[in-house]
From Swiss-Prot:
One of its GO terms (cellular component) is extracellular region. GO terms for biological process: chemical synaptic transmission; response to light stimulus. It is found in: Secreted. It comes from the Eukaryota. The modification Alanine amide is found at residue 18. Keywords: Amidation, Hormone, Neurotransmitter, Secreted. This is Pigment-dispersing hormone. Belongs to the arthropod PDH family. Residues 6-9 are annotated as: Important for DRPH activity. Causes the migration of the distal retinal pigment into the proximal end of the pigment chromatophore cells and thus decreases the amount of light entering the retinulas. May also function as a neurotransmitter and/or neuromodulator. GO terms for molecular function: hormone activity. The lineage of its organism: Eukaryota, Metazoa, Ecdysozoa, Arthropoda, Crustacea.
Length: 18
C-alpha cells in the first residue's frame, strides 16, 4: 500500500524534478 501511494505521489515529483 505504501509503495503504491508513494509511486502515485512520487510520480509528479520525479517529472517535476526532471
Amino acid at each position: 500500500n505504501s509503495e503504491l501511494i508513494n509511486s502515485i505521489l512520487g510520480l509528479p515529483k520525479v517529472m517535476n524534478d526532471a
